[in-house]
């Protein structure tokens, strides 16, 4: 992962940009993030920085997780740990601020967990057109044929069918940073991002 931060999705809104045009944005509360571990080529085989985000109660964390946070001299337990690359000269226990990473008009990508939709059919899940809607049709939202007869005598793997939809890691790329409120740790990015409100996301700088 590239240089970035952890945050949560607060919701969507409309704001006016400098040209007076209304822009649809998603509001993200990014940080405060603290460095919980610095991984090096010598010790771990690769270089990365692990950031911690989101206060948690001690009873909700394991002893190993609590010990990991305590070793990093972070005052309060954190519930989310994510590794990023591209950081230089950061110390364990230090805070990484929003203004240190992002600026206006930056191009970013946002990764989150998409909303769970439960069990859905092929029309909603895969965008199938479906059949005729009337005049005696019995084929409306059905998937249709799933294979041949004796040959090959089986259903090929990967065939699009109904099933569980959503609750998957999803990334949206090439979003623009429209506005930043460093005091409130808020980032306004153009367009929608995956996940529900209060869902955890990572925002990474592109380029």
UniProtKB/Swiss-Prot annotation:
<feature type="region of interest" description="Disordered">
    <location>
        <begin position="129"/>
        <end position="152"/>
    </location>
</feature>
<dbReference type="GO" id="GO:0022625">
    <property type="term" value="C:cytosolic large ribosomal subunit"/>
</dbReference>
<keyword id="KW-0694">RNA-binding</keyword>
<dbReference type="InterPro" id="IPR019927">
    <property type="entry name" value="Ribosomal_uL3_bac/org-type"/>
</dbReference>
<dbReference type="InterPro" id="IPR000597">
    <property type="entry name" value="Ribosomal_uL3"/>
</dbReference>
<comment type="subunit">
    <text>Part of the 50S ribosomal subunit. Forms a cluster with proteins L14 and L19.</text>
</comment>
<protein>
    <recommendedName>
        <fullName>Large ribosomal subunit protein uL3</fullName>
    </recommendedName>
</protein>
<dbReference type="GO" id="GO:0006412">
    <property type="term" value="P:translation"/>
</dbReference>
<comment type="similarity">
    <text>Belongs to the universal ribosomal protein uL3 family.</text>
</comment>
<dbReference type="GO" id="GO:0003735">
    <property type="term" value="F:structural constituent of ribosome"/>
</dbReference>
<dbReference type="Pfam" id="PF00297">
    <property type="entry name" value="Ribosomal_L3"/>
</dbReference>
<dbReference type="GO" id="GO:0019843">
    <property type="term" value="F:rRNA binding"/>
</dbReference>
<dbReference type="InterPro" id="IPR009000">
    <property type="entry name" value="Transl_B-barrel_sf"/>
</dbReference>
<keyword id="KW-0699">rRNA-binding</keyword>
<comment type="function">
    <text>One of the primary rRNA binding proteins, it binds directly near the 3'-end of the 23S rRNA, where it nucleates assembly of the 50S subunit.</text>
</comment>
<keyword id="KW-0687">Ribonucleoprotein</keyword>
<keyword id="KW-0689">Ribosomal protein</keyword>
